[in-house]
Curated annotation (Swiss-Prot):
Species assigned in the record: Methanocaldococcus jannaschii (strain ATCC 43067 / DSM 2661 / JAL-1 / JCM 10045 / NBRC 100440) (Methanococcus jannaschii)
Gene3D superfamilies: Hypothetical protein af1432 (1.10.3210.10)
Domain HD residue range list: 51-173
Organism ancestry: Archaea, Methanobacteriati, Methanobacteriota, Methanomada group, Methanococci
Protein name: Uncharacterized protein MJ1020
Amino acid sequence: MGRDMDFEELNSLQGIPKMIYDELIKNKKVNTFLKMSNIMAVGRLGYNDHGKTHAKIVANNAIKMLKILYKKGIEPSFVKDCKGSFEDSLVITLLGAYLHDIGNSVHRDIHHLHSAYLALDIVENILKKYYKEEKAYQMTTEVLHAIYSHSEGIMGLTIEAGVIAVADGTDMTKGRSRIPICKKCYDIHSVSAASIERVEIKEGDEKPIQIEVILSNEAGIFQIQEVLGEKIKWSGIKNYVSVYARVEKEKPVFEEITI
């Protein structure tokens, strides 16, 4: 999976999840927040993509992992704790994943908190169109929990939140960077990020979810440990995820470096 993926999970949504996804991608407030998130993160801070493409990738991958877990007999938390349906959990995952980074439009610092309060009205207004009031409010709190806990250092307490956090970490291929690596300006972060060719999510043998990271250079191991590893650590679903890395074609990331 590179960043030119076809969003198979998003494109195959049906029923209420599809209607909500169609509404999300057309929502002017959501689109503006995502645009401003990239202006803040990429344009002003020199970070990687936190806009619409990132939102779609995280949503797609989170839904894929939720389905794998459900197939393996692991109930989503909203199903287990609130007597909801799998479709309800799918909606929670979709909304939480798509909106998790909109708080970057305010500031990168505590962006998970900014994302939660910016998402509140958006999520409530959407859910109240499809669900009775009490259920809409229940689902809203689950979405906000998932958004808030996607950041490292905050433990996810639901399956839905967990798959979103891990999915966030899977978007780490070299194509995510909107800032070309400056010649002779390399560090371990930029070299490692440039070494990630693609990420593949599939059913695992030892654990339900297997994430395979294909590298062009062993320097990418740093990115796996520092980005994806930290997301998994705090996701609350660590016991359900295994990660494998392999170098497909060893090639240099840089020719020379100046210290």
